[in-house]
Amino acid sequence: MTRQRSTRRGAWRALRTIVLLGVGLAVVTVGGPVVYQRAMSAGLMYRVDNAPVRDVALVLGAGVEPSGRPSPYLAARLDLGLALLQAGKVRAILVSGDNGERFYNEPDAMRRYLVAKGAPADKVIADYAGFDTYASCMRADRIFGTTSVIVVTQTYHLARAVATCRALGLDAVGVGDDTVRALSVDTWRWGQLREVAAAVKMAGDLIGRRQPLLGPRETSLDAALGR
């Protein structure tokens, strides 16, 4: 009987140790990237009025409606990009999004929206392979030749976007939108929750030095910047 109890105690201790190790690993796996992105972006997130001057507003893509119009989230990002251009904080806008399907084209929708709002057409450059934040940041440097950017997205995404760009060598700061939160608090909270998993993916991309779709060097942004 004593031996059985001892065996059971040993089994429970082993199980408890395994559970604690698993919890600890989960905390490090999830918590580590979140802490990293906050540290990398600390003091680098601004409003339009107090943002430092950079060459380019890098506006990250989001959903486009079936009509071809930017979703409210994307429109809010584009409005910030235009405000930065009009305030003289940037000299050009790089719209970077998904064009991976025949009838879905974020960059063209973004560019049309900005030009219709008064942005000079020659100052709005489209990146058609910005399939995620990591790709958009890397392509801004490798394909479009700029490292001086203000990243524009929603505020819950901003720390990761700035951290990713800076980890890839860009002199990046960020300006974020939170006006769309009023449209649906649940949608906003879901976006915040998704950022936890996205932070882990960011860490994997950076550690593994993932190579997104690149291609030949583009000169359209050089022309927009007059260089």
PLM feature spans:
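A general, composition-driven signal for non-globular sequence regions
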Residues: T2-G10, S71, S148, E195
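N-terminal type II signal-anchor transmembrane helix
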Residues: R3-D49
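A structural signal for short, hydrophobic/glycine-enriched beta-strand patches
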Residues: V35-L193
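A general structural signal for short secondary-structure boundary/capping elements
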Residues: G100-E106, V173, V196-A203, T219-A224
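A transmembrane-helix-recognition feature enriched in membrane-embedded lipid enzymes
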Residues: R189-Q211
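Short linear elements at protein peripheries
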Residues: R209-R227
